[in-house]
């Protein structure tokens, strides 16, 4: 093994003076030595490489791996590295039933096959389904950080992530599979153990405003895809990365939220619905949203948020936390946000719900997804 000081310096120097790789590669697609898709970027723009350079101890294999990541140079001689990047799976975000303009209706079976349910174990060992989540790949699920902090405050711990759940009443007793009329295969709910979960390091609550309310959950095994289980797309492609999610006040921007949350407005409504519901929501003016959820000092509603809704009785509610706020682009569903917080009484006229803006966190997500798995 080598000391961090000497090897890190040597590697940085090596990366900086490597001028024989060819110019003009910056921001172009590339492939890491491990076969993972990536983008050719500056060293300082790649959190994955920076993490490697910060390691306390280096082995020879680390040096070889970093050398293999070089993908070109800039005109000034600075090195470019192939930074692993999340790539949507080819068939993500399927629009099974088309894009429907509705509000507060039951979903169709298999309509949002990326919906997942977080299950927590209480002190008495009873299992509770308590928050929604979104499947984004065979191994990763996204939800809200506050789902975990709220569970921890009650002495609960994460038990599993369930996919292919649609209607709790369809699986009464011990039945995990149910044959549904009109489908060739049964719908089979399945629970996956959690390998790790990464809460955003700067998550906090400021005067009721949840900031950086996002958690990445890695499953212990690959999810099996079928007609009832598939990932939603993330805003990483060229045609979606530049969409004005979270910053546009255009009321024509339309989202869809889904979850098992309460269907009754009011502070006392804290239960969950048996049936997976969906609701159509329009973008809400960000400046008005900031004033409604004004904080006395510090960080409040900002770039990391999307505000949507504001029409009486059309809102996400208790139990919807962690679930997806979705936008359809070209007939494909993308994860725009994560249900975060709102007014204590759901569905109040003129008051929107607030969602974590996924596009704002793509850099952090990519960094955490690839942390430690490529070296």
Swiss-Prot record:
Expressed by a subpopulation of hemocytes. GO terms for molecular function: serine-type endopeptidase activity. It is found in: Secreted. Its EC number is 3.4.21.-. The record marks 100-101 as: Cleavage. Disulfide bonds join 30-82, 40-71, 46-83, 131-147, 289-307, 317-346. The keyword Hydrolase applies. It is an enzyme of class 3 (hydrolase). Keywords: Disulfide bond, Glycoprotein, Hydrolase, Immunity, Innate immunity, Protease, Secreted, Serine protease, Signal. It holds the Pfam family CLIP. InterPro entries: CLIP (IPR022700), CLIP_sf (IPR038565), Peptidase_S1_PA (IPR009003), Peptidase_S1_PA_chymotrypsin (IPR043504), Peptidase_S1A (IPR001314), Ser/Thr_Proteases_Immune/Dev (IPR051487), Trypsin_dom (IPR001254), TRYPSIN_HIS (IPR018114). The clip domain consists of 35-55 residues which are 'knitted' together usually by 3 conserved disulfide bonds forming a clip-like compact structure. Belongs to the peptidase S1 family. CLIP subfamily. Serine protease. Plays a role in innate immunity against infections by parasite P.berghei and by Gram-negative bacteria such as E.coli. In response to P.berghei infection, contributes to the clearing of parasite ookinetes independent of melanization, an innate immune response which consists in the deposition of melanin pigments on invading pathogens and parasites. May play a role in non-septic wound healing. This is CLIP domain-containing serine protease B14. The gene is CLIPB14.
């Amino acid at each position: 093994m080598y000391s961090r000081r000497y090897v890190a310096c040597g590697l940085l120097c090596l990366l900086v003076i490597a001028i024989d790789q060819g110019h003009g590669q910056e921001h172009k697609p590339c492939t890491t030595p491990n076969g993972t898709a990536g983008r050719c970027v500056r060293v300082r723009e790649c959190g994955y490489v920076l993490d490697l350079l910060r390691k306390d101890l280096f082995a020879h294999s680390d040096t070889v791996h970093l050398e293999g990541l070089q993908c070109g140079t800039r005109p000034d001689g600075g090195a470019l590295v192939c930074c692993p990047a999340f790539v949507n799976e080819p068939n993500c975000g399927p629009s099974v039933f088309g894009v429907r303009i509705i509000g507060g209706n039951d979903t169709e079976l298999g309509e949002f096959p990326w919906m997942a349910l977080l299950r927590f174990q209480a002190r008495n060992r009873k299992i509770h389904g308590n928050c929604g989540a979104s499947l984004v790949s065979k191994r990763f699920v996204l939800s809200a950080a506050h789902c975990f902090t709220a569970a921890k405050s009650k002495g609960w711990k994460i038990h599993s992530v369930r996919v292919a759940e649609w209607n709790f009443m369809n699986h009464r007793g011990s039945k995990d599979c149910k044959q549904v009329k009109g489908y060739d295969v049964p719908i089979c709910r399945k629970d996956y153990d959690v390998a790790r979960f990464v809460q955003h390091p700067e998550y906090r609550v400021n005067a009721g405003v949840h900031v950086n309310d996002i958690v990445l959950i890695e499953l212990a095994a690959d999810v099996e895809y079928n007609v009832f289980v598939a990932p939603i797309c993330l805003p990483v492609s060229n045609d979606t990365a530049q969409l004005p999610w979270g910053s546009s006040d255009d009321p024509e921007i339309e989202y869809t939220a889904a979850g098992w949350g309460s269907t009754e407005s009011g502070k006392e409504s804290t239960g969950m619905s048996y049936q997976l519901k969906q609701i159509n929501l329009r973008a809400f003016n960000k400046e008005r949203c900031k004033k409604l959820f004004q904080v006395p000092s510090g960080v409040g509603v900002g770039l990391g948020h999307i505000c949507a809704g504001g029409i009486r009785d059309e809102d996400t509610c208790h139990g919807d936390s962690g679930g997806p706020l979705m936008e359809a682009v070209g007939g494909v569903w993308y994860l725009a946000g994560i249900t975060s917080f709102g007014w204590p009484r759901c569905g109040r006229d003129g008051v929107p719900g607030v969602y974590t803006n996924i596009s704002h966190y793509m850099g952090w997500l990519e960094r955490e997804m690839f942390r430690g798995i490529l070296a």
